[in-house]
Curated annotation (Swiss-Prot):
Transmembrane segments: none annotated. Part of the RNA polymerase complex. InterPro entries: RBP11-like, RBP11-like_dimer, RNA_pol_Rpb11_13-16kDa_CS, Rpo11-like. It is an enzyme of class 2 (transferase). The keyword Cytoplasm applies. PROSITE patterns: RNA_POL_L_13KD. The keyword Cytoplasm applies. DNA-dependent RNA polymerase (RNAP) catalyzes the transcription of DNA into RNA using the four ribonucleoside triphosphates as substrates. GO terms for biological process: DNA-templated transcription. This is DNA-directed RNA polymerase subunit Rpo11. Keywords: Cytoplasm, DNA-directed RNA polymerase, Nucleotidyltransferase, Transcription, Transferase. Its EC number is 2.7.7.6.
Length: 92
């Protein structure tokens, strides 16, 4: 059984997203923030983890153009593409 990501949207509008991910630390958000930081449509992106025993990550994203969910989708697609390329490099 795969783990379920538990997200609580704290704020969402046409240019800004703030959420809390329960049970998450750096593993998910470090690469996501890295890829979003390279997106020219992103004004800023950050995440913070509360006390390590709590394992809650807080994520904030503000975009200049488009909407924050589209920016996340682009970043996730880029991450998946890079992982597929890495996999081909190892197993081809």
């Amino acid at each position: 059984m795969s783990p379920v990501l538990r997200l609580e949207i704290l704020k969402l509008d046409d240019k800004y997203l703030e959420l809390k991910a329960k049970g998450e630390t750096y593993t998910l958000f470090s690469p996501l923030v890295e890829y979003l930081s390279n997106d020219p449509d992103v004004e800023y992106v950050q995440f913070d983890v509360d006390h390590p025993l709590q394992e809650n990550a807080y994520f904030k994203l503000k975009v200049k153009r488009g909407n924050p969910l589209e920016a996340i989708q682009r970043a996730v697609n880029a991450i998946l593409s890079d992982l597929e390329e890495l996999e081909r490099g190892f197993f081809s």
